[in-house]
Amino acid sequence: METNIVEVENFVQQSEERRGSAFTQEVKRYLERYPNTQYVDVLLTDLNGCFRGKRIPVSSLKKLEKGCYFPASVFAMDILGNVVEEAGLGQEMGEPDRTCVPVLGSLTPSAADPEFIGQMLLTMVDEDGAPFDVEPRNVLNRLWQQLRQRGLFPVVAVELEFYLLDRQRDAEGYLQPPCAPGTDDRNTQSQVYSVDNLNHFADVLNDIDELAQLQLIPADGAVAEASPGQFEINLYHTDNVLEACDDALALKRLVRLMAEKHKMHATFMAKPYEEHAGSGMHIHISMQNNRGENVLSDAEGEDSPLLKKMLAGMIDLMPSSMALLAPNVNSYRRFQPGMYVPTQASWGHNNRTVALRIPCGDRHNHRVEYRVAGADANPYLVMAAIFAGILHGLDNELPLQEEVEGNGLEQEGLPFPIRQSDALGEFIENDHLRRYLGERFCHVYHACKNDELLQFERLITETEIEWMLKNA
């Protein structure tokens, strides 16, 4: 198997000898540390950021060295796991299998049962041995490599917001916050940064933290967020972009499983409550040269010309990237005034009302916080949209709009599409995105999300019946 790019030590692109040796050593070390392991979940990540895979007996793990097979159509599934034939990866191709190989370094205990079950990521390769170009992880890797080839090395961190929910709906059938464990005290107030809220849910939050450490997820602990039952967990910054997204998805799975253990639900749905803030996925990004120096500021700590190019590119592609940043119908309910979320493409310093925020810090920590994506988005694709914007800014002479000062929600800016249908239209029509992300990926993603939208629009809701039954 030939390698396409040698700069990034990507597991798929190593020689078979080196890969086999590294895999064998990883399995050996893991089983020495976790000798009671009986099964291993081998996992691919689909377009929606959902894990697809199977559970194999630990005796079969070493056979994974040369890969296993999954259908290519796993990357043409809707949110419910149904293959979307319009994407062209299913029956039209004869439902072909493709080889999937382990991602080196991803073998960890599973949050489902860490003593007896492990988990390992897979990545798909095409018939010619190249990375399968529709897999979100491979889409991101290709863009990451392009930046590295230009001598630019991103350092990123992911922040994720989520809600803990009661398993029981309220009297009207709506979602509701959980009671504090062991009490009948249901928090209905917004208490951002409340330590008391952390204490009330210490058992589940501590379990999340302990399992994150066991899985080597570099999490920074939980913060009580703006709404009842809402929390945020931040991941430490890293220069391994793929691992940052691997960890974000592993964390989402872990949080859900730990909530179930404590008789609650956890959701990363963008907007579970009409009256409360939604949940976002914020990405912090800085850029280094090959000497490890931050190149987003000059010697005086001011914004560098490179940063301004990056900002211009990210802003220009942001509206067309909304289909990736807000991937579901519910995602667009999050973009409302007064809900701590930007509603147009904008930038500014130390300003949480803009889409691209440059936080406080010295020149060594100069970075951008990309504040648009929902927690329901696929982190590989959010990061890919960001990198596409950065490359777009580097490749073209784009004007940078004026910095926003004050409340960016009340000022003129480049608006986002506010409906999924509009976002999908802008996405598929953007030549720059198709070039950076790949024609086939864009076709498959658009087909799958458009099919989901059509399914949703065929549904007849209780609200429609209530409004129209006697009034139409």
Swiss-Prot record:
Q: Which residues form the GS catalytic domain?
A: 136-472
* Main EC class the enzyme belongs to: ligase
- Which keywords describe this protein according to UniProt? ATP-binding, Ligase, Magnesium, Manganese, Nucleotide-binding
Q: Effect of gene disruption?
A: Cells lacking this gene cannot grow on putrescine as the sole source of carbon or nitrogen.
Noted pH dependence of activity: Optimum pH is 9.
Pathway annotation:
Amine and polyamine degradation; putrescine degradation; 4-aminobutanoate from putrescine: step 1/4
What is the free-text note on the cofactor? Requires Mg(2+), that can be substituted by Mn(2+).
Consequence of substituting H282N:
Activity is impaired to 9% of wild-type
Q: Which GO terms describe its molecular function?
A: ATP binding; glutamate-putrescine ligase activity; glutamine synthetase activity
- Provide the GO biological process annotations: glutamine biosynthetic process; polyamine catabolic process; putrescine catabolic process
The reaction(s) annotated as catalysed by this protein in its Swiss-Prot or TrEMBL entry are: putrescine + L-glutamate + ATP = gamma-L-glutamylputrescine + ADP + phosphate + H(+)
Q: Does the keyword Disulfide bond apply?
A: no
- Cofactors that this protein relies on: Mg(2+); Mn(2+)
Q: What induces it?
A: Induced by putrescine and repressed by PuuR. Transiently induced by cold shock.
**Enzyme Commission no:** 6.3.1.11
Q: Which residues form the GS beta-grasp domain?
A: 35-129
Concerning InterPro entries, the annotation shows:
Gln_synt_N, Gln_synt_N_sf, Gln_synth/guanido_kin_cat_dom, Gln_synth_cat_dom, Gln_synth_gly_rich_site
Can you list the disulfide-bonded cysteine pairs?
A: none
Q: In which domain of life is the source organism classified? A: Bacteria
What's its job? Answer: Involved in the breakdown of putrescine. Catalyzes the ATP-dependent gamma-glutamylation of putrescine, producing gamma-L-glutamylputrescine. Absolutely essential to utilize putrescine as both nitrogen and carbon sources and to decrease the toxicity of putrescine, which can lead to inhibition of cell growth and protein synthesis. In vitro is also able to use several diamines, and spermidine and spermine, instead of putrescine, but with a much lower activity, and cannot catalyze the gamma-glutamylation of ornithine or GABA.
Q: Which family does it belong to?
A: Belongs to the glutamine synthetase family.
Record note on quaternary structure: Dodecamer.
Q: What is this protein called?
A: Gamma-glutamylputrescine synthetase PuuA
Species assigned in the record: Escherichia coli (strain K12)
